[in-house]
């Protein structure tokens, strides 16, 4: 059975979590600290006596800030650090019960699906060595079928299989050596391979869960079937290992442990929550449905039971982190009950020119490094000077100030436009070295920046 410690929350300290986030995200220290503390509190809670543990509720977080400043990126990086079931959803995907669309309980189902998948992968890793041994035996059986004698119509297939003779054992050992040395990789063998019976069922919007259950039902009805296939050994091996690993893991234990992990350590990130907020100066229309989504979210965040195909989960101790730009609305426009369920508020800062310079140079996978590596595949060596980085950051900042502020995403647009010609011609410029300096940037982008009408449509 999977150990209960397999999926306990991350044991990283808040300082270590912030340091890890710093490798990928520039600035926003307040948001990083809040997320790090919340993640550490998951671990702290699990160290308490069970009676007290059930009384400690997670302190949900609301992140507020303009688009492109790192809210979603924090969530994406958090997923890799959490070592717990984690799901990110957009609030705009959901509608009030009774309207066409997904209901908010789908969040709980998605979380359990994620946990079961993660647990299953962990279980398969643990039994992989044994699965590889079984797969090897099946390949050898296909290469050298074992002799069997018929005793009668009612005889069991395993009971009538004879022990291999000394000659057969020697031949089998020889083939095993050849198999392990890779000499037989291209040899074709005939195998009985399990068939996954899948049926595509079209369902109306909002009824995806019913469609999933119907697909599962038809899959179970047709389960256990196999078909003969001729495959090269190198293609057959991964299929057989996967099949044998699936036989070795205990699905019931995986499901039970996954539900436990969701209830105790699950984390849900709800993005774009400001898009389901009713604006104070409007009445009726779509705002009715938006407020309905908030009311549907409320029991989920407060703590309720959600039915999934793996069993019922309680959401009392799931950590919810919500984020939104709140351009046209305010956090106070959320319904009061939901406001109270997000006691920790964090405001993310708009990005300055200095932040853009850091974004272009500091992160592990900075945009400039990405372009350098991409063009290196064509044999082109790309280098950015300091004054080029400064000018790119300045242009991105100016365009954001002049038009809609889309934060760091503006850098993608500016760099793509700057390097468009080079990216197009790079296959014909193998072996060249290209240095991007301030003059190069001005030559390619200067006119666009000067003309507000052009930059509005191109940058």
UniProtKB/Swiss-Prot annotation:
Q: Any one cellular component term from GO for this entry?
A: HslUV protease complex
Please, which domain of life does this record's source organism belong to? Bacteria
SUPFAM superfamilies attached to this UniProt entry? P-loop containing nucleoside triphosphate hydrolases (SSF52540)
- UniProt-listed GO biological process terms: protein unfolding; proteolysis involved in protein catabolic process
Q: What is its main location?
A: cytoplasm
Give its localization.
Cytoplasm
Alphabetized CDD domains for the sequence: RecA-like_HslU
Give the UniProt keywords, A-Z.
Answer: ATP-binding, Chaperone, Cytoplasm, Nucleotide-binding, Stress response
UniProt entry tagged with the keyword Cytoplasm: yes
Any one GO MF term held by the record is: ATP hydrolysis activity
Q: Where does the record place a coiled coil? A: none
What HAMAP family does the database record attribute to this sequence? Answer: HslU
Family to which the UniProt record says this protein belongs: Belongs to the ClpX chaperone family. HslU subfamily.
Job of this protein: ATPase subunit of a proteasome-like degradation complex; this subunit has chaperone activity. The binding of ATP and its subsequent hydrolysis by HslU are essential for unfolding of protein substrates subsequently hydrolyzed by HslV. HslU recognizes the N-terminal part of its protein substrates and unfolds these before they are guided to HslV for hydrolysis.
Protein name per Swiss-Prot or TrEMBL: ATP-dependent protease ATPase subunit HslU
Q: Which organism is it from?
A: Xylella fastidiosa (strain M23)
């Amino acid at each position: 059975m999977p150990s209960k410690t397999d999926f306990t929350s991350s044991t990283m300290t808040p300082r270590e979590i912030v340091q890890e986030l710093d490798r990928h995200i520039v600035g926003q220290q307040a948001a990083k600290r809040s997320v790090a503390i919340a993640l550490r509190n998951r671990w702290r809670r699990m160290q308490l006596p069970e009676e007290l543990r059930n009384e400690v509720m997670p302190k949900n977080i609301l992140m507020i800030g303009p688009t492109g400043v790192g809210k979603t990126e924090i969530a994406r990086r958090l997923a890799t650090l959490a070592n717990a079931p984690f799901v990110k959803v957009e609030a705009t995907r959901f509608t009030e019960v009774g309207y066409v669309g997904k209901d908010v309980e789908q969040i709980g189902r998605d979380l359990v699906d994620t946990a079961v998948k993660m647990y299953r992968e962990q279980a398969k890793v643990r039994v992989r060595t044994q699965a590889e041994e079984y797969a090897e035996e099946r390949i050898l059986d296909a290469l050298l079928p074992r002799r069997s004698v018929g005793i009668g119509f009612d005889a069991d297939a395993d009971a009538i299989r004879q022990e291999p003779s000394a000659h057969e054992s020697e031949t089998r050992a020889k083939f095993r050596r050849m198999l392990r040395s890779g000499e037989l990789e291209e040899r074709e063998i005939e195998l009985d391979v399990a068939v996954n019976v899948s049926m595509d069922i079209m369902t109306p919007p909002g009824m995806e869960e019913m469609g999933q259950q119907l697909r599962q039902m038809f899959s179970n009805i047709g389960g256990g079937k196999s078909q003969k296939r001729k495959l090269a050994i190198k293609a057959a091996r991964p299929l057989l290992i996967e099949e044998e690993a699936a036989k070795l893991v205990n699905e019931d234990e995986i499901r039970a442990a996954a539900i436990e992990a969701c209830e105790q350590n699950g984390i849900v990130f709800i993005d774009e929550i400001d898009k389901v907020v009713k604006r104070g100066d409007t009445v009726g229309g779509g705002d009715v449905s938006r407020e309905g989504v908030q009311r549907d979210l409320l029991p989920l965040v407060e703590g309720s039971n959600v039915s999934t195909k793996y069993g019922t989960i309680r959401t009392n101790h799931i950590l919810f982190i919500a984020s939104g730009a709140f351009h046209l609305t305010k956090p106070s426009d959320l319904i009061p009950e939901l406001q109270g369920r997000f006691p920790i508020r964090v405001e993310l800062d708009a990005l300055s020119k200095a932040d853009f310079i850091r974004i272009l140079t500091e992160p592990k996978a900075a945009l400039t490094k990405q372009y350098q590596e991409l063009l290196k595949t064509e044999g082109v060596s790309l280098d950015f000077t300091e004054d080029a980085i400064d000018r790119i950051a300045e242009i991105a900042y100016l365009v954001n100030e002049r038009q809609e502020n889309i934060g760091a995403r503006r850098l993608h647009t500016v760099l793509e436009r700057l390097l468009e010609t080079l990216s197009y011609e790079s296959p014909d410029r193998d072996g060249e070295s290209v240095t991007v300096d301030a003059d190069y940037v001005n030559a390619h982008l200067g006119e666009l920046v000067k003309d507000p009408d052009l930059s509005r449509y191109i940058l």
